[in-house]
């Protein structure tokens, strides 16, 4: 089974485990690290996820994966918090984290409202409207970034 197929099936199985517990699947990674395949799930919930939450999800998911047995290679299962620099993956993330500091990287050079072209934008997330993410940049100007131009977006933690 291809990596993308595994990630897709894992997403479906994980959602069945997480949703009843009030947990959210943020991201699934299935990749080779050294000689070993690693299946890594990042999960979250309002107020943050605990180590006990991760352990419970790992146990339950491991049992289901052992029964379904659709991953043919040996792998290590890891369940983790998305961390302080949580990725923004879903449209709802751009609404939920409005007002927070984010870093957005785009696939191509884009201009802010003053015409400065860049691929990395750092600013306070205003929100998402009609498929466009709006940030108030650290320099004060606005940047409007089409969602389909975003390569990666993360919350940024300020010390």
Swiss-Prot record:
Keywords: Cytoplasm, Ribosome biogenesis
UniProt subcellular location: Cytoplasm
Gene3D superfamilies: Ribosome maturation factor RimP, C-terminal domain (2.30.30.180), RimP-like superfamily, N-terminal (3.30.300.70)
SUPFAM superfamilies: YhbC-like, C-terminal domain (SSF74942), YhbC-like, N-terminal domain (SSF75420)
Top-rank lineage group of the source organism: Bacteria
Pfam hit, one: RimP_N
Free-text function comment from the UniProt entry: Required for maturation of 30S ribosomal subunits.
PANTHER family: RIBOSOME MATURATION FACTOR RIMP
Name the record gives this protein: Ribosome maturation factor RimP
Organism of origin: Geobacter sulfurreducens (strain ATCC 51573 / DSM 12127 / PCA)
């Amino acid at each position: 089974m291809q990596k993308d197929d595994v990630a897709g099936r894992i997403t479906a199985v994980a959602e069945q485990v997480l949703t009843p517990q009030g947990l959210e699947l943020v991201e699934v990674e299935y990749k080779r690290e050294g000689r070993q395949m690693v299946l890594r799930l990042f999960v979250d919930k309002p107020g943050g996820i605990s180590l006990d939450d991760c352990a419970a999800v790992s146990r339950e998911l491991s049992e289901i994966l052992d029964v379904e047995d659709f991953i043919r290679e040996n792998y290590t299962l890891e369940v983790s918090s998305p961390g302080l620099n949580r990725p923004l993956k879903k449209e709802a993330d751009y609404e939920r984290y409005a007002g927070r500091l984010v870093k957005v990287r785009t696939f191509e050079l884009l201009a802010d409202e003053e015409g400065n072209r860049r691929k990395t934008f750092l600013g306070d997330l205003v929100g998402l409207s009609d498929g466009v993410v709006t940030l108030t940049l650290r320099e004060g100007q606005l940047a409007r970034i089409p969602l389909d131009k975003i390569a990666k977006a993360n919350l940024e933690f300020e010390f």
